[in-house]
Amino acid sequence: MADMDRRRISILGSTGSIGVNTLDVVAQLGGRDAFDIVAITGNSNVTLLAEQARTFGARLAVTADDKQYATLKDALAGTGIEVAAGRAALVEAGQRPSDWVMAAIVGTAGLAPTVAAAERGADIALANKECLVSAGELFVKAVADGGGKLIPVDSEHSAIFQSLEDDQRHAVERIVLTASGGPFRTWSREQMANVTADVARAHPNWSMGLKISIGSASMFNKALEMIEAKHLFNVRPDQIEVIVHPQSIIHSMVGYTDGSVLAQLGCPDMRTAIGYALSYPDRPKLDVERLDFAKLARLDFEAPDETRFPALRLARTAMDRGGVQGAVMNAAEETAFNAFLEKRISFLQMADIAEDVMEDMVGYGSAITMDDVFAADAEARRRAAEAIAQKEMAA
């Protein structure tokens, strides 16, 4: 197939869980015969990054880790594949002309390259939460001004996107995000007090990366998704509900003013949402497990406990306050998450750190430009680091 007939795509974060699944979908839908892989990026796993670049014929391979540049360069020697490293190179990957970009870099590091892709008019398949949580209205405007489409990849937001009737947006009454409840759904706070990262990362239904898995256990993942939903679907905070659904079969729902509720169901497999985003508005034929209703037997639901999982309450606080509070909450939680991995604070203290920093930064600045967002992010990380150090001293 000639280059002009292939769809040009880039994958920001190709070595993570979403990136690996995206390339699986690309392979199912024709691989390098159907797709021109303009750029792929990874963090420190340059062995996998080089393998992906070779397999799919990527034009550019970028590692975020400057120290891995030589290793990646050697691994791709003689292939003709361009190699680059560092934060600026990630932004360059987002700027390279392509039709569709998978935004799957975890954390605030994914914000600048995704904005760069949006500003030049690419369709954005959004898996990075921070673009909307931290930059919200600014990011949505960047996509709109660029002229591309914004297609959510999170299973919950993909479900809502698929359940929204375009000509009935005015009739949307509520958005219902489902949550598995994670591995600690039935645990008391006392039981959760001393859990380790290895225990927290064991999600009952989904296969995900470390950050998202532990975020699911603490329900910070769901808290971020609440803020995302507000910006993605232009709804009020009071229209966003969370319901715990342990089986993860109903991925989310939309309630309308006539009492109807539309939902998207499927087996827990990220490739379904990825395939939908890649093929939108069409639906691809994918080799994924089909839902067997006879074997389901039951679907359970329960209200979330915001005492045991305060992240949900913090999300509502951030939405009500507006400004840079989303960026502050996210930055403080990311900093606390890293401290938890390093065994410097406990599982429950992650939410404490986020809440303390949010309270400390009430009224801090405004989100008028991306620089405002980055400044708030940096300040929140600084204050979170101080709070973590204080908890260590008190321990």
Question: What is the role of each PLM region?
Answer:
Residues M1-A395:
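Catalytic, metal-anchored helix/loop core of enzyme active sites in primary metabolism
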